[in-house]
Amino acid sequence: MQIDLLQEARRQAEICNACRYCEGYCSVFPALQAERAFSDGDLTQLANLCHNCRGCYYACEYTAPHEFELNLPQALADVRQDSWEEFAFPRAAGKAFQKKGLAIVLATVLGFALLFWAARALAAAGGEGFYAVLSHNAMVAIFLPAFLFPLFSIAIGLRRYWQTVGGAPVRLSHLRGA
């Protein structure tokens, strides 16, 4: 995580916590008021609670031109963006997608096209209807990794996030109470 983004979010969160004018606006403020000092994990949690509705920004008397220049939604959005890149699996793909998204999409489309071409050119389908073009086994070979890898990536990202925010192990009693 970028230290300067966290420091700015921490500065603004501490001012907001002292003011508490916006305490009923969204789920960020009850979580904000639960702490007096904010760790990096706390700020990451607050950033991911914020939906960037900007209600607190428009109500705040400490936005520019005030010397505090508060813009909590922007500070939290920057931390949230950085956390998404940090927790993505694989990390290199999370960072690259922000800068080279079109290239990644084109590479993915080209990769799927090559898989379909290879399945059609290398294996005789031998079936009826659509299976005469592409066999069931070829479809499973193509789409099973395309289904499982995102689930695996989400699980890794969620685990990284949960460790960063200091989440406790989830138990069945937590799920019942939710």
Which sequence ranges carry the predicted segments?
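Short helix-capping and inter-helix turn/linker motifs at the boundaries of alpha-helical repeat units
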Residues: 2-7, 37-38
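Iron-sulfur-cluster electron-transfer modules
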Residues: 13, 34, 38-178
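Local sequence-structure signature of Cys/Sec-based thiol-disulfide redox active-site neighborhoods
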Residues: 6-15
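N-terminal cofactor/phosphate-binding cores enriched in small/glycine residues
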Residues: 15-35
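Extended, hydrophobic alpha-helical segments in both membrane/secreted and soluble proteins
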Residues: 1, 12, 21-26, 56, ...
